[in-house]
């Protein structure tokens, strides 16, 4: 079995936006599915982990796209493990058309938790470090890893939303992709008629659960470029704890 997994997806029309191209949230979901398929096929996926009360949780995700697949387009998500440490592992993605067209790339960081205590676990203790047998350090992923999203006290409050049944995933907390969708809803349809997302980053800090209210704060990144369309977002739950930060770059 290859170290790099390749999985076919379809840009279904109901997963596409008004322009007929795949939603960023659905692309993120395809990447997470590819990660699950890849890890399960190689013996360290969720199917096995749940038998030992462990689970993968997404810590960081960065996606950079040249363009999004159009509706009805078949494409592959390639994924591979770049490295593995005791508490974190880095997994990369490539989004490739059936004709070889390179749509874009993704980078992610994952942790493993004990599903009872919700505390981090030693990744290398699972099956005597079996993940190390699948590391592919030489395959290129030519996008930045991304860093800490810096925000000042001047970030403006945008809105507060409620969380419900459809926001919750198999781990019992708010789904990683739901945060992506909620962040991208901060801009209206008219904005998206004139701009597209070139790069999206999100870092998950703390869990939120059904019933929590999530408050969104946003500011334009100050990088001395007046033409820059990069925005930073902070999400805070009911008790004031920050859940995650996101950076969105438009062109």
Name each region found by the language model.
Residues 1-58, 105-107, 114-198:
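Hot-dog-fold acyl-thioester-processing enzymes
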Residues 2-7, 64-147, 204, 208-210, ...:
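HotDog/MaoC-like acyl-thioester-processing domains
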Residues 53-68, 195-207:
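Small beta-barrel nucleic-acid-binding modules, principally OB-folds
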Residues 159-247:
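Acidic/His-leaning functional-site neighborhoods
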């Amino acid at each position: 079995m290859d170290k790099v997994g390749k999985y076919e997806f379809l840009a279904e029309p109901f997963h596409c936006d008004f322009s007929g191209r795949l939603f960023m949230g659905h692309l993120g979901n395809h990447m997470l599915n590819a990660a699950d398929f890849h890890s399960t096929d190689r013996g360290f996926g969720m199917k096995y982990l749940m038998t030992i009360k462990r689970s993968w949780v997404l810590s960081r995700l960065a996606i950079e796209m040249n363009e999004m697949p159009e509706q009805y387009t078949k494409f592959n998500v390639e994924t591979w493990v770049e490295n593995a440490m005791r508490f974190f592992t880095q997994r990369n993605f490539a989004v490739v058309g059936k004709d070889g067209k390179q749509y874009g790339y993704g980078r992610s960081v994952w942790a493993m938790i004990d599903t009872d205590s919700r505390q981090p676990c030693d990744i290398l203790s699972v099956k005597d470090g079996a993940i190390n047998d699948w590391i592919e350090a030489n395959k290129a992923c030519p996008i930045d890893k991304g860093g800490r999203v810096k925000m000042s006290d001047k970030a403006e409050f945008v809105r507060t939303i409620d969380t419900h049944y459809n926001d919750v995933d198999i781990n019992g907390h708010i789904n990683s992709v739901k945060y992506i969708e909620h962040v991208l809803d901060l801009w209206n349809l008219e904005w998206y008629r004139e701009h597209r997302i070139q790069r999206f980053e999100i870092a998950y800090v703390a869990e939120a659960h059904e019933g929590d209210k999530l408050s969104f704060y946003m500011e334009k990144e100050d990088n001395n470029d007046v033409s820059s369309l990069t925005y930073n977002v902070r999400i805070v739950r009911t008790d004031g704890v920050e859940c995650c930060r996101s950076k969105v770059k438009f062109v």
